[in-house]
Regions:
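Acidic, His- and aromatic-enriched active-site or binding-groove loops in soluble protein domains
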Residues: 2-28, 126-133
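Short, solvent-exposed loop/turn segments at the edges of secondary structure
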Residues: 10, 207-211, 263
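Active-site-proximal cap/lid insertion segments
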Residues: 24-230, 242-258
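Short beta-strand/turn segments that mark the catalytic/cofactor-handling region
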Residues: 275-286
């Protein structure tokens, strides 16, 4: 996996600019634009050593292969999600304000290894609340609880850091007069068990793992509040295309790279405009 070498292949999906990270764990063994950034600053091997220290695998708590939740030991400006936010804002500042654009900004956190910078950790006390949802008769050792408490704290800190990065990015849109014309979609790919059901990380069909947020700001539309109808991440594609005035089903029915014949994508604009309550009765997840 080398996003730097495969940049032209990735542009075949329609992007004019790509700056991709392999992820905190993958940067240990793979190269990417974030790895290139670190290498140019002479930091790559140091960061790889740090990432190799802590980061357990998916599975149950009992395997003791849990994350050490060590704070990021380098400058905050070099943290993966801070760099990602800075690159996004650079692109927005360079883009002609009168031209339409599509931008996907994918932050790595909150994700293992739990490595929030100390400044953000200091915003949250280390709460030792033994409120884990567990199978009947299941017990978590004090050692494992302490690790999970640290992970929970770091997850909150990483979310706060991402909040700040999103806020700064919205500020750029506002400063350039682009905010009121921009459809904004906020979501994630998965949640985290963080000790519930005696599990860590993801990959199981519990609410903590598959229940993720989808928040949308539609310019010119009155807020419709909270809607608990099921949606899929794939619905974002049709929603964006529909908002851009394109025939989503025609565009997504191409043989490559789309796969709409396998996982249909449905526009959420009717829901966002308050015209209907839902676009699907069930969703698919794996």
């Amino acid at each position: 996996m080398d996003p730097v070498a495969g940049e032209q292949d990735e542009k075949s999906y329609g992007y004019d600019f790509i700056w991709e990270t392999a992820g905190k764990q993958q940067v240990v063994s793979n190269y990417c634009f974030y790895g290139d950034y670190l290498a140019k600053k002479g930091m790559l091997e140091q960061v790889r050593d740090f990432f190799s220290q802590g980061g357990g695998k998916n599975g149950d708590v009992a395997n003791h292969n849990y994350d050490k939740a060590l704070p990021w030991p380098f400058d905050e400006e070099d943290y993966i999600d801070v760099v990602t936010g800075c690159v996004a804002r650079e692109q927005l500042r360079a883009h002609p304000a009168e031209q339409p654009f599509y931008m996907m900004v994918s932050f790595c956190g909150p994700h293992k290894p739990y490595d929030a910078p100390q400044r953000y950790l200091d915003m949250f006390p280390l709460e030792r609340e033994d409120d884990f949802i567990l199978p009947e008769g299941q017990i978590i050792s004090d050692e494992d609880k302490e690790s999970l408490y640290r992970q929970r704290r770091s997850a909150k800190a990483m979310i706060r850091l991402i909040d700040d990065q999103i806020g700064e990015t919205l500020d750029v849109l506002r400063e350039r007069g682009m905010l009121d014309d921009t459809l904004i979609v906020f979501t994630s790919d998965h949640g985290d068990m963080l000790g519930d059901h005696f599990m860590i990380q993801k990959g199981v069909p519990w609410k903590q793992s598959v229940g993720i947020p989808l928040a949308v700001r539609l310019p010119g539309a009155a807020p419709v509040g909270e809607n608990i109808a099921p949606v899929e991440i794939s619905d974002i594609a049709a929603t964006v295309l529909d908002y851009a005035g394109l025939d989503a089903q025609r565009v997504l029915s191409r043989s490559w790279p789309a796969y709409n014949d396998i996982i249909p994508s449905r526009s959420l604009l009717p829901v966002l405009r308050g015209e209907q309550e839902r676009v699907r009765d069930f969703c698919f997840s794996e």
